Amino acid sequence: MVQTLKLYSQSEAYMNKTLVFQSDFGLVDGAVSAMEGVALQVDSELKLHHLTHDITPYNIFEGSYRLFQTVNYWPEGTVFVSVVDPGVGTNRKSVVAKTKTGQYIVTPDNGTLTHLNKYLGIVELREIEESINRRKNTELSYTFHGRDVYAYTGARLAAGVITYEEVGKELPLSDIVELDVVETEYDAAEKSVKGCVDILDVRFGSLWTSISRDDFYQLNPEFGKRYEVSIFHENMLAYQNQVVYQHSFAEVPVGSPLLYINSVYRVGIAINQGSFARAYNVGTGTNWKIRIRAID
């Protein structure tokens, strides 16, 4: 049997026809389905997937973090369309970023690229040329760029209809809009590390902090040992207790709190089979500070 080898164009050679959507749209109306339909009109053989559509409305930081949590695990050539866009219809830029590991992010440049740029690495940025990369006859539509610009451009890129260079002009990486990220503070005299509550492990109510594993390791932590955990909201103490550090949840009794290293190698705080966030009314963001102190 003679096999025929398919010759790929430059654009097809590194695109894998995989498109992953993220948004704050939810699934209660037709917005997500409309984006899927636009993508399949471009190429019915595209493989469509969904990161989440339950980003808290308008929460750009959360959208940025979920990309950081996910992108690195997808194959090179995967295209992500992320639409958390409270500035839709304004003069904020629409871009496609290429990551160090070869994935592409189609998004408004409004801070959504913050965590990828800081922790994974973005190597190239291009502004979407909407005179070419926009659905026809949508020029007077100002409130659904997720469908008309981002899903359309993402699908064309994933399908190999356009090359990355054909997205639009290259922009300096210094143009990337970034949100504030709290840096970990290590206090040798106090034997403590300080950061903030970045985000929740939403379904289970665990806190995911900004304190990296390496930063936490400056305390020379030991499994089974207790550490003083203090959480502050607007500089007011919201929680303080001695919490045990363990590998995972089942190593403490049901209903007990623990410190652990989560799946993105940050310090997490959880309750075994319970919600820490709900139990102690803890939120997320730079105004929710946390201090972990070694106890002599």
Predicted regions located by residue number:
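Active-site histidine-anchored catalytic micro-motif
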Residues: 18, 30, 42-48, 62, ...
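A residue-level signal for conserved active-site and pocket-lining positions in enzyme catalytic cores
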Residues: 24, 153, 272
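N-terminal beta-loop-helix "entrance" segment that forms/cooperates
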Residues: 50-70
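Anionic-ligand-binding alpha/beta catalytic cores of soluble enzymes and soluble regulatory domains
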Residues: 138-223
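A conserved acidic, glycine/proline-rich C-terminal tail/linker
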Residues: 207-281
